[in-house]
Amino acid sequence: MRFSPILSLYISRHFIMAFLGALGVIMGLIFLFDVIELMRRTATHAEIPFSAILEMALFKLPNMVQLILPFAVMIGAMAAFWTMTRSRELVVTRSVGVSAWEILAPVLVVVLLIGVVNVTAFDPLSATLYKRYERLQDDMMLRGSASPLQVGENGLWLRETHGEQQVVVHANAVRQEGFDLRLREVSVYVSDANEHFLYGVEAALGQLDKGFFHLTDVFILRPGHPVESAPSYDFQTQLTLAKVQDNFASPETISFWELPSFINFFESSGFSANRQKLFFQSLLSSPLLLMAMVLVAAVFSLKPNLRSGGIMIRVVGGVVSGFLFYFFSKVVYALGLSATLPVVMAAWTPPVVTGLVGLAALFHLEDG
């Protein structure tokens, strides 16, 4: 296979322009629909200015870009190849002995670079902005009340209301063992409705079980009273193990570079990090998925003889194929989340299968 630098740059430029155009149009539509949806959700909050709605839509946009990036690549590749085919540029190029693989090579290299930049540079930016978007949602009360529970490397923090009392619970270390949640260095602070401190409980160990914190090696602190010690102390709570697991930070808000440490933390604490591991592997496989989408686009747009007809059928076929592969990837992803499939298999199967199907179709069209 021969490579012409001039031809490669020319094809790459055509693809980049078509890709940016497709990405820009899709981003504009997503931004418009997000603004409309946020306006609907804030209709009962007259105090929220329109500038805040625009800010939220902008913070969410990078995360949506990552979701639609494969479609933008496929549409951009189809548009670039169709433009060059209609202008007879590809016809002339193919007539002098340039194969489809030589035409695709520069596009695949560009897409690989786009995928690497997306994972290593754009994803951290997207995670930071999406985290700010979720905080704005909580501040503006657009998704119910903010979560009273936080679990992370700083331990567990919980805020609950018991009648007219406010309760804050903190544990420096938390670990899941089977169906039990075990805590170390537990502090409980109880205040009244006016946030006046009533009493506190310090415990060396704790366990969450059936709506109660069972604390051991306890010291009870009351204002104006000496410190009391007790072998155990039971404290009622609304917290469950399922709520703790559901409260883990969504992987979309964690940078690609920080995901491994988060995964190690959760696994060392005995929790399942399946969701984070699957998201991390999906990021690693995303450049391959983008390249596979180029192959799918080429199957429906590299045919040089436009007089053979069926142009609209091939365009529709390309779009439908893209959505079918997307649906397939979501089904496999769901199987990975449920631990039906291994994480690596669930993350890498869709791009590998898509790429192999594209390669097989191109081999058939190119070499018969």
Name the predicted role of every residue range.
Residues 10, 14-18, 102-115:
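Start (N-cap) of specific transmembrane helices in multi-pass transporter permeases
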Residues 94-99, 339:
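Short helix-to-coil transition segments within interhelical loops
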Residues 50, 111-224:
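Non-transmembrane, extracytosolic/lumenal segments of membrane-associated proteins
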